[in-house]
Design a protein with these regions (language model features):
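Immediate flanking context of iron-sulfur cluster ligation sites
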Residues: 4, 31-61, 85-109
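C-terminal catalytic lobe of FAD-dependent flavoproteins
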Residues: 4, 12-37, 42-45, 373, ...
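Beta1-alpha1 glycine-rich phosphate/pyrophosphate-binding loop at the start
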Residues: 5-32, 41-44, 68-82, 89-92, ...
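Feature captures the FAD/FMN-dependent oxidoreductase FAD-binding
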Residues: 87, 149, 154-158, 206-255, ...
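Glycine-rich Rossmann-fold phosphate-binding loop(s) that bind the pyrophosphate
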Residues: 159-162, 299-301, 462
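FAD-site-proximal beta/loop scaffold in flavoenzymes
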Residues: 261-292, 391-467
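A conserved FAD-binding loop/helix module that cradles the flavin
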Residues: 304-307, 314, 460-494
């Protein structure tokens, strides 16, 4: 511990976000990060606890407390403070294949479990992670390191999201020849087309993919396995197959008027927006235009928030976000103690921008869609919503929602974006391989395992555990790589945590 009194001497400092009214003029990342010396002092705030909950990654009451990757947080925080940036990078990379992604899009489970945050402000671990990886790139020691020896084994990874990339990266490091297939035109999966550019600039993904290519990973884009190439051919050509196709089947809203023109799934809306941005800087007009339109977003999660920010950047007349659940408390409740994940109300970047532009929070809580209202031409013109009440079912103990009679409200809407989550993977890919599914329509495996019901076929990521965070996807990819390696070699020397 380089500075035992650091948490008392230095206040928490984090990057500064650009003013909302300025940042909505562009689609770039909008945080100004601390200078290197100031960031170094933030490392001194880490207490190097005897029991570092920040890296525990344990489940408490169904939620993760601490980093699921078990990042060696106290170690590299101290190395940042002492100026050993390269060693900090080495320790960070030991558990995390892609700190350039997690330092941008992770909700920082580590900080929520930080002991320093129990009676004060937590260590700015996410910002330290960002500084470590970006310094590694600028100093040149994040360069490609191809494996010295090849095993002669071939592995196909289907899907290039965070889980597929993590599995591919580790399997390639082990010496296996890895080919990653991606059905889209660009590598990255969720990272590329599911997360807007202002949260994760796509050049960051391209930068890492270029390194993986130099290390020997082969990427094939525009290829839809199960349609363009049969599963049987893949199983013939490769020793093992890893399914990493994500949970890409969006949950729909079954309400009258659903066939109205102007209703889109959020995933399609965000993909079209990013693709148009990258292809032509929006000149091709191949995105959903929200300029001058009333936009209603169904869903209160991260994807819904991304839709808020994207719609505002295109000049929406109004943006409303519908959330089924009650508003969370502003402060942690007594029955939600540290180190549990704090169930408190958070205002994300898109909602901040809506407040700045429209003068009010876009969220309407405890509500659901009752009807999509069409004009005479079949286009959407309004949405009818109704308020909900939540009560505990005495028989099951679960919360049960009920519509409140007479609480209907009409919202003007020419565009509706459905961000209501996902219901497993696309059926054609699971059918193509004949893998067994569980009751949640995820690919079934034994608990804690990654081998599917089909010989030589493994699964990882959201396709395995259901819709989740990027950090969980990376952990799944690492563990799946270990399982694949063990099945190929009879043992595995991959260090996954």
């Amino acid at each position: 511990m380089g500075k035992p009194t650091g948490f008392m001497e230095y206040k928490r400092e984090v990057s500064v976000a650009e003013d909302p009214k300025k940042r909505i003029q562009h689609f770039n990342e909008f945080h100004e990060h601390l200078p290197k010396e100031k960031q170094r002092l933030q490392g001194a705030r880490c207490m190097e606890c005897g029991v570092p909950f920040c890296q525990s990654g344990m489940m408490i009451c169904g939620m993760a407390s601490g980093c699921p990757l078990h990042n060696l947080v106290p170690e590299w925080n101290d190395l940042v403070y002492t100026g050993n940036w390269q060693q900090a990078y080495n320790r960070l990379k030991k558990t995390n294949n892609f700190p350039e992604f997690t330092s941008r899009v992770c909700p920082a489970l580590c900080e929520a479990a930080c002991t320093c945050g129990l009676n004060g402000d937590p260590v700015s671990t996410k910002e330290n992670e960002y500084a470590i990886i970006e310094n590694a790139y600028s100093e040149g020691y994040a360069a490609a390191k191809p494996p010295v020896v090849r095993t002669g084994k071939k592995v196909a990874v289907i899907g290039s999201g965070p889980s597929g990339l993590a599995a591919a990266d580790l399997l390639n490091q082990r010496g296996h020849q890895v080919t990653v297939s991606e059905r889209s035109d660009r590598v990255g999966g969720l990272l590329m087309y599911g997360i807007p550019n202002m949260k994760l600039e796509k050049q960051i993904i391209d930068r890492k993919i270029a390194i993986m290519k130099k290390e020997g990973v082969t990427f094939v884009t525009g290829t839809d396995i199960g349609k363009d190439i049969k599963a049987s051919k893949l199983l013939h050509d490769f020793d093992r197959v890893v399914l990493a196709c994500g949970a890409s089947n969006p949950r729909d809203i079954n309400a009258p008027g659903r066939d109205a023109r102007g209703i889109y799934f959020a995933v399609d809306f965000l993909k079209a927006n990013t693709k148009s941005l990258l292809d032509s800087n929006f000149e091709d007009k191949k995105y959903v235009e929200t300029k001058g339109k009333n936009v209603v977003i169904i869903g209160g999660g991260d994807t819904g928030n991304d839709c808020v920010g994207t719609s505002i950047r295109h000049g929406a007349k109004s943006v409303t976000q519908i959330e089924m659940m009650p508003k969370a408390p502003d402060k942690r409740a007594e029955n939600n103690p540290w180190p549990e994940w704090p169930k408190v109300c958070k205002t994300d970047y898109g909602q901040e921008e809506a407040i700045a532009v429209y003068g009010q929070d876009p969220r309407i809580y405890e509500s659901t869609v009752k009807e999509f209202i069409k004009d005479k031409n079949g286009s959407l013109k309004a949405v009818k919503i109704v308020k909900l009440s939540w009560e505990k079912d005495p028989a099951t103990g679960r919360m049960k929602m009920q519509e409140i009679a007479g609480s209907e409200q009409i919202l003007d809407a020419e565009i509706v974006l459905i961000a209501a989550g996902f219901l497993g993977s696309q059926k054609y890919i699971t059918d193509a391989f004949g893998v067994e599914l569980n009751e949640r329509t995820n690919v079934k495996t034994a608990p804690g395992k990654y081998q599917t019901s089909v010989e030589n076929v493994f699964v990882t990521g959201d396709m395995h555990r259901g819709q989740s965070l990027v950090v969980w996807a990376i952990r799944e990819g690492r563990e799946a790589a270990h399982a694949v390696d063990e099945s190929l070699m009879g043992y595995s020397n991959l260090v996954i945590q």
